[in-house]
Design a protein with these regions (language model features):
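N-terminal periplasmic/intermembrane-space "pro-region" immediately following the signal or transit peptide
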Residues: 1-48, 345
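Outer membrane beta-barrel
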Residues: 29-188, 196-202, 207-216, 275-278, ...
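A generic beta-sheet turn/junction motif
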Residues: 92, 244-248, 345
Length: 345
């Protein structure tokens, strides 16, 4: 972990130094009377509705019609350097999902503080619109905090803390960035909760973009979580993955595993998924996905095919078939059909 942090620090200093020497900007006047240099706040949201059929024993062919998500957000910028965002979830148990301010003057180095996505896995930071299938992978759910394997409730892959990130070394005719990094310090308890033990989680990633649109990345997480019984459970995890998104083609694959203290405390666990998205027409894209979770020698495999009918940037319909071989369930083999409607405003 120390070697990773030192390497990332050296890259940040090198990349930021180059940017500062090459960039001259006009500094606005800072004053408590200043009212300019502020964007009009953008207000928006989206709704995801669904119908789900399952032939799993005890599912009663359900759950049927459901509202998966209603999200509302406000974002904007001040001085073009400071960005802010507040996001609410309106359905189910309404709550604040994101709130943060980010100093983002330079692409090479920015600082974000508040409540936001953990910097763990490629898929976790993605918007549900961009995942390609009806839900996040088992890997993200159990290893990034969407119903964690340790028993933490679904925190949407988020926590409260501070994070630095940036993109370094533009290369090629397109001047795409060779290296992306993120390093964050978090409470460890998830959203809308205070730190329970004074310790902090450290999560970081280092990613390389050797070709435009292709990222190879490694992620590390060292921390702990305090459950409702007051027990402190270690979270020590690694993740390795790749993603390719260009010209509407998508390939994404990741592998995550627990290590050291978490492995010895709660048993060995790992997960893997692979997703391929193929554009058929401008409005039709087909995804195929293999999703696997192993926890203490119990295994859940899920295979799916999903058609996305993207009729508009802000309108999408999905039809997905899922086959499960889930040894965590009493009747492991079952089929599901999901139909989803996405609308954004």
């Amino acid at each position: 972990m120390k070697r990773i942090l030192l390497t990332m620090a050296a890259l940040v200093l090198a990349g930021t130094g180059l940017a500062l020497s090459a960039q001259e900007t006009e500094t606005p006047e800072y004053s408590y009377k200043q009212t300019g240099f502020m964007s009009t706040p953008k207000v928006g949201g989206y709704i995801i509705g669904s119908y789900k059929y399952s032939d799993q024993d005890g599912a009663h062919n359900g759950p049927g019609f459901n509202c998966r998500l209603i999200r509302l957000y406000v974002d904007g910028s001040i001085f073009n350097d400071f960005k802010y965002r507040i996001q609410f979830q309106a359905n189910g148990n309404p709550h604040v999902k994101d709130f943060y301010i980010e100093w983002a003057k330079y692409k090479e180095f920015s600082v974000k503080v508040g409540q936001f996505k953990r910097a763990f896995t490629f898929e976790n930071p993605m918007n549900p619109w961009d995942v390609g299938v009806g839900d996040f992978s088992l890997l993200v759910q159990k290893f990034a905090g969407m119903g964690d394997r340790l028993g933490e409730a679904n925190m949407g892959g988020r926590d409260q803390g501070i994070q630095i990130q940036g993109d370094l070394f533009p290369i090629g005719d397109a001047q795409y960035r060779l290296i992306h990094y993120q390093l964050g310090v978090y409470n460890g308890q998830g959203i809308n909760l205070a730190d329970a033990n004074g310790a902090k989680d450290i999560i970081g990633t280092l990613q390389i973009q050797p070709l435009q649109g292709l990222y190879l990345g490694a992620f590390a997480w060292k921390g702990d979580w305090v459950n409702n019984a007051g027990e402190t459970l270690k979270r020590q995890r690694l993740n390795f993955g790749m993603k390719y998104d260009k010209d509407n083609w998508t390939v994404r694959a990741e592998y995550a595993t627990n290590i050291r203290g978490e492995k010895s405390q709660t048993g060995a666990a790992d997960a893997f998924y692979a997703t391929v998205g193929v554009p058929v027409m401008d409005w039709l894209k087909i995804y195929a996905k293999w999703d696997e979770l192993r926890d203490n020698d119990v295994r859940h495999d899920m295979y799916s095919a999903c058609a996305n009918f993207r009729l508009h940037k802000n309108l999408n319909f999905q039809l997905e078939y899922r086959y499960h071989n889930n040894k965590f369930a009493a009747s492991p083999k079952y089929n599901e059909i999901w139909a989803m409607a996405y609308i954004r405003f």
